[in-house]
Regions:
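Glycine-rich phosphate-binding loop of ATP-dependent small-molecule kinases
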Residues: 1-222
Length: 222
């Protein structure tokens, strides 16, 4: 990825180091009162940012990736619950249709990119190819290699067009992932979150770690 886009991206190597450390140990939890206090402050910041986006015509694209149960959906819900759906839009695409499979891989994501005055949040993104699809065998290694080669150019084109691109990887430790999956199984209010894919991916922890690290290296801007 060109250095010009660097100011709009998280540093890949730093993210890789952080997530690799999380493989072994889960960070300490915040106390509920501290979390609620901080969230109120951040909600106010988000509302202020929303007004800035509307006033300036900014285009913001946020991509959330991470392991299953890492908290992507919950994080996105927390971000969007106090802002306007006219400005903030969440994109969570289903499995590709047969027609989409025949198209250029990145094509299905392009119509969802933000216009002026919009914030678009992807709950999983084009990085599916480097993560889920690779680990679960839904694409070939040749397709993964091509994607990792082309994605910096795609993202550079986004940035050049005026889109502010932010990418986040959410990590979870093996023990915490086990606890969260068991919670979904045992709680009828959460069972809808559990899929066959969750259970299959659970057994492929190190495959996901390797895919994650390869993804960081290929999309690093430093």
């Amino acid at each position: 990825m060109a250095k010009k886009a660097n100011r709009h991206h998280e540093n890949g190597r730093a993210a890789a180091a952080t997530s690799a450390a999380a493989d072994g140990k889960q960070p300490a939890r915040m106390k509920t009162k501290d979390y609620l206090r901080e969230k109120r402050r951040l909600d106010a910041d988000l509302v202020a940012m929303q007004e800035w986006v509307k006033a300036t015509g900014a285009k913001i694209c946020v991509a959330f990736e991470g392991r299953d149960t890492a908290g992507k959906g919950g994080t996105i819900k927390a971000i969007t619950e106090r802002v306007s759906p006219r400005v903030f839009r969440v994109v969570a695409l289903p499995a590709p249709t047969e027609r989409e499979k025949s198209q250029m891989y990145i094509q299905r994501y392009i119509p969802h990119l933000p216009a002026a005055g919009e914030v678009v949040i992807f709950d999983r993104s084009w990085y599916n190819r480097a993560g889920v699809e690779r680990v679960m065998g839904f694409c070939t290694e040749e397709q993964v290699a091509f994607f990792l080669k082309e994605v910096p150019e795609f993202e550079q084109a986004m940035v050049t067009s005026g889109i502010l691109l932010l990418k986040y990887w959410l990590e979870v430790s093996p023990d915490e992932q086990t606890r969260r999956l068991e919670s979904r199984i045992d709680d009828p209010r959460k069972i809808w979150k559990l899929s066959d894919m969750d259970l299959k991916s659970y057994s492929r922890w190190y495959d996901y770690s390797r895919a994650r690290d390869d993804m960081f290296k290929a999309s690093d801007t430093a």
